[in-house]
């Protein structure tokens, strides 16, 4: 009897050890593919090691891909491996929904699917020699504007809607605001594919003003660039979404990573890299770094109607308002 019990205990011990070894192997073999827009690489260089130090992140490794948000979305649709996508704006995630790659309820999750916020800023030469402070200043003759192409860069779409919405807020009619957009694009000297490429172009000495994310201006200053930036009085709240792919073979780990990114510790890392936290307590703790603007509006306000209306009206590559403007100035729409 004792011999039979001993054999049973040995079998159970062996089975438990095998299960533990199997779980350890799965943990060690877990690799998440992160596909993101062009700017947050420096933040993720800190966030990923911080996640790996948590129980959920132990043994999880990452592959990372960064580029223009629209291009990244199209690349995932074309087959670029991805478990997690962090893109510039909702339409680029919605394109993945239409392709059957992301759950339609991605924006019903915590914080409506948003992981960071930002605002549009004007990055200027040291001393602001052209005295640029307002959206109207961008229309002055002789002002050279650096703005990425809105048909590849999500950041550029935020820039365009920040400009259009601000002019509408000033009392301009739709037609007048569209006319101002044309004047703005006539002053654009370089249209790069992404916000990061546009920043590099500006830092190389081209242009008088760069339209970009607040985080890009802060990143440039952290690296010692002699630039300054202005947050216009009327501005748009930029909301950067994140989602897990439906076909991910590591959904549990991917969702654990998303939950980690919204912890106070992770949100502080984002704040350190120039991104406005979505967790209110962390945003309040960094209030001096991220000044409030009374004229801040969202893509759902001022009659804009949200991205579901803005995307086709402004950015349809064939019939959109901005596509028509690009054709007039000789720009690309794809």
Identify the function of each model-found stretch:
Residues 127-133, 152, 165-173, 247-254:
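Short helix-loop capping/hinge motifs at secondary-structure junctions, enriched
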Residues 170-233, 241:
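Ligand-binding pocket segment of bilobal, Venus flytrap-like solute-binding proteins
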Residues 49-56, 136-196, 200:
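Ligand-binding cleft/hinge of the Venus flytrap
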Residues 1-31, 334:
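Short, low-complexity disordered leader/linker segments with a strong preference
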Residues 45, 49-57, 77-81, 90, ...:
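Sec-exported extracytoplasmic/periplasmic mature domains
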């Amino acid at each position: 009897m004792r011999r039979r019990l001993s054999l049973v205990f040995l079998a159970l011990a062996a089975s438990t050890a095998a299960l533990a070894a199997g779980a350890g192997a799965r943990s060690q073999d877990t690799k998440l593919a992160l596909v993101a827009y062009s700017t947050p690489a420096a933040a993720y260089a800190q966030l990923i090691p911080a996640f790996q130090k948590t129980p959920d992140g132990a043994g999880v490794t990452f592959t990372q891909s960064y580029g223009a948000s629209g291009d990244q979305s199209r690349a995932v649709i074309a087959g670029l491996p991805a478990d997690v996508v962090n893109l510039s704006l909702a339409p680029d995630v919605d394109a993945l929904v239409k392709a059957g790659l992301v759950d339609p309820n991605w924006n019903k999750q915590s914080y409506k699917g948003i992981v960071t916020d930002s605002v549009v800023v004007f990055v200027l030469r040291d001393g602001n020699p052209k005295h640029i402070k307002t959206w109207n200043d961008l229309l002055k003759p002789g002002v050279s504007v650096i703005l990425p192409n809105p048909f590849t860069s999500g950041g550029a779409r935020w820039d365009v809607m920040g400009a259009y919405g601000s002019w509408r807020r000033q009392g301009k009619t739709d037609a007048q605001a569209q006319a101002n957009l044309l004047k703005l694009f006539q002053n654009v000297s370089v249209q790069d594919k992404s916000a990061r490429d546009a920043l590099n172009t500006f830092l190389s000495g081209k242009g008088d003003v760069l339209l970009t994310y607040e985080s890009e201006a802060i990143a440039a200053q952290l690296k010692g660039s002699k630039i300054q930036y202005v947050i216009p009085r009327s501005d748009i709240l930029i909301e950067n979404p994140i989602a897990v792919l439906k076909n991910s073979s590591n959904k549990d780990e991917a969702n654990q990573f998303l939950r980690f990114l919204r912890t106070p510790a992770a949100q502080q890392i984002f704040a350190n890299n120039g991104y406005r936290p979505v967790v209110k307590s962390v945003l309040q703790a960094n209030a001096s770094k991220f000044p409030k603007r009374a004229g801040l509006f969202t893509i759902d306000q001022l009659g804009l109607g949200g991205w579901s209306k803005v995307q086709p009206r402004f950015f349809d590559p064939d019939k959109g308002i901005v596509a028509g403007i690009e054709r007039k100035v000789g720009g690309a729409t794809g």
